[in-house]
């Protein structure tokens, strides 16, 4: 069957948000997805859409955890799940509709309507991209809302005083170290160590090479190992990936400590501050050698999107 020629924006992404008063909290972890359909072929196709691996990690890791339930609609067994995707046969083009918080708080309900299993397979690339982006935006929004309600005001004021910008710091990240136009915040975790750095440099430096070079110089000056010469560097043997998020430039890649075995993933958000002729960057990096990192990085990435120029 010929693929339908529609751009992602024409997937009919219709949102409906219900009031949260009196509703229970949804069940499940971020990026948990429950698929509901009567047709096994539809379940298999959409499940395949969720099988992507997350970019910018040392090893391949899937971001989404998927379970399936057979049925036409949401029922008592599935209605409180965090993200529910109902796949239905309907006449017309393949399209997506979604609702926020229909049965519970912090919940996303997605309907994928398609005329047939063959049509859904033909449209799978564009449908998958739209579905993944929709769930990712939902999880980012939930995380940012949580941080606004559970933040570390003391460290937020430290960043504001040192850098002259605003960023929402989660309440469970408490340790900090300051330098010149630089703040390093960490939870000092033993199994997984989560870190956020915020820094500013003079001049507007937003090209890809400038962002990487700037990162190396700032991190080498402020994050050092136990012995002389141990400094943090960007891993140049792996690609650094760049994307846009509004006015911000997002970079993803790997870091390592020169002269040591430490390393892991990082993600950064860079903003030009034209009024002060400077460049602001907020970065998250993780050291977790024996555990998965995808969801931890996504959770920290949501923190970075709260970066705001005063």
Describe these PLM feature segments.
Residues 1-7:
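Positively charged n-region of N-terminal signal peptides that target proteins for export
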Residues 12-15:
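C-terminal motif of bacterial Sec signal peptides marking the signal peptidase cleavage site
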Residues 19-107:
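Start-of-domain marker
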Residues 19-21, 34-40, 170-226, 230, ...:
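Secretory pathway targeting signatures of secreted, lumenal, and periplasmic proteins
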Residues 32-35, 100-160:
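Long, acidic/polar, low-complexity amphipathic helices and coiled-coil-like
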Residues 69-118, 223-277, 291-292, 305:
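Signature of long, low-cysteine stretches enriched in small and polar/charged residues
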Residues 121-145, 167, 173, 279-310:
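Surface-exposed amphipathic alpha-helical segments
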């Amino acid at each position: 069957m010929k693929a339908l020629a529609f751009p992602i924006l024409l997937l009919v992404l219709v949102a409906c948000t219900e009031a949260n008063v009196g509703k229970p909290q949804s069940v499940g972890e971020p990026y948990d997805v429950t698929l509901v359909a009567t047709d096994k072929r539809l379940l298999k196709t959409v499940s395949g859409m969720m099988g992507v691996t997350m970019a910018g990690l040392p090893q391949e890791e899937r971001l989404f955890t998927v379970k399936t339930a057979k049925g036409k609609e949401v029922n008592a067994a599935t209605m409180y799940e965090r993200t529910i995707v109902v796949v239905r046969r309907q006449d017309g083009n393949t399209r997506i509709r979604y609702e926020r918080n229909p049965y519970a708080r912090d919940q996303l309900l997605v309907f994928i309507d398609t005329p047939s299993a063959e049509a859904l397979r033909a449209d799978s690339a564009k449908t998958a991209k739209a579905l993944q982006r929709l769930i990712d935006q939902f999880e980012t929004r939930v995380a940012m809302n949580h941080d606004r309600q559970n933040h570390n005001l003391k460290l937020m004021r430290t960043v504001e005083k040192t850098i002259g910008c605003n960023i929402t710091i989660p309440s469970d990240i408490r340790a900090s170290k300051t330098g010149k136009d630089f703040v390093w915040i960490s939870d000092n975790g033993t199994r997984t160590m989560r870190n956020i750095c915020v820094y500013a440099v003079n001049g507007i430096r937003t090209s890809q090479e400038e962002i990487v070079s700037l990162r190396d110089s700032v991190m080498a000056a402020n994050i050092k190992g136990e012995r002389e010469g141990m400094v943090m560097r960007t891993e140049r043997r792996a690609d650094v990936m760049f994307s846009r998020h509004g006015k911000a430039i997002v970079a993803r890649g790997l870091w390592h400590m020169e002269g040591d075995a430490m390393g892991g993933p990082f993600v950064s958000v860079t903003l030009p501050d034209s009024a002060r002729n400077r460049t602001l960057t907020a970065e998250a990096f993780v050291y977790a050698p024996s555990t998965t990192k995808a969801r931890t990085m996504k959770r920290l990435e949501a923190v970075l999107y709260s970066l705001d120029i005063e």
